[in-house]
Amino acid sequence: MARRRKIASWLIVSAAISILAGCGAPGVERSQSVTDARRAVPDKTGYADVNGARFYFQTYGDLGSGKRPLLVLHGSFMSSEAMAPLIDGFAVTRPVIAFDARGHGRTGDLQGPFTYAQMADDAVGVLNALKVPSADVLGYSMGGVTAVVMAVRFPDKVGKQVIVSGVSRRDGWYPEVLQGMARITPETFAGSPLEKEYKRLSPTPEAFPALVGKIREQEAADYDQADEAVRAIQNKTMIIVGDADGVQLDHALKLFMLRGGGDRKAAAQGFLPEAPRARLAVLPATSHIGIMASGPLISELSIPFLDDTKPVVPPGFLK
């Protein structure tokens, strides 16, 4: 019984992401560039028609500017609105697209089960509907898995990827996380902020039990991406996890290595002569939920990656 209460508490706490996203998390020091900027406001909102389904989207900045946009993918039980802490820092540097995944937010319930392949198809469909030929992709949790699947299946549509607390294989999660997800029911969330937020946003507020069931089934299914397929992803990858994340650190490290991390030549010479193919960041004292309070830090780490900024060598070390 105590174990079930602990699982329920973990999930209900995740609901606070949606509530806190609109006002930022307390106790987090924001960078000067983000502090000086106002909370990003979408330049356009609407619905994208994708194969008979309608997906709510938000865009920031000018998609026709010629600069590759960043597609932001939210996690389970969340919405594009809940990703505001991450969007803020990126929207001052590039166009940003966010949308509500099937069953979530203002998109609402759609027929059929959830699969990561379908979610990747949906994301590409939104890009096509917005006439965006390709985008860099940042995904958190469920969105991180979707970003990996997108990069494997649609190499021409996906530029760089920022995988935040996401995996390429189901066993990348700790077993306890998978066990917890297998036990969720609509009753787990009864009266929780998460359920209330869903009903506030959704055009199908009565479908919350269906959302819970579809997410539970999606997380129980096999969505593993073969190591060879991950290694073959064309563009660069950054992996960001917390040191107390639901993602196993061994998996994050393996994903980093598969994507070209661990440059032994650079290790031997002591510096990176050019921007690497893969980057790995492990945030200290940070959990799977807590990483959403690190929006400014995530953008500060990710923007140089997206811009292919060459790592700095301190003066006095090279001729």
Regions found by a protein language model. Give the residues of each.
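Catalytic active-site module of serine/aspartate enzymes centered on a nucleophile-bearing elbow/loop
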Residues: 272-319
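Short beta-strand/loop motif that positions the catalytic acidic residue
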Residues: 233, 239-241
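Conserved HGGG/HGGXW glycine-rich cap/lid loop of the alpha/beta-hydrolase fold
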Residues: 53-106
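Alpha/beta-hydrolase fold catalytic core
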Residues: 2-3, 8-12, 17-68, 93, ...
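Active-site nucleophile elbow and catalytic-triad environment of alpha/beta-hydrolase enzymes
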Residues: 213-229
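Flexible "cap/lid" loop of the alpha/beta hydrolase fold
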Residues: 145-153, 159-195
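Conserved loop-alpha-helix segment in the C-terminal half of the alpha/beta-hydrolase fold
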Residues: 243-286, 294
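Active-site loop/oxyanion-hole signature of alpha/beta-hydrolase fold enzymes
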Residues: 98-138
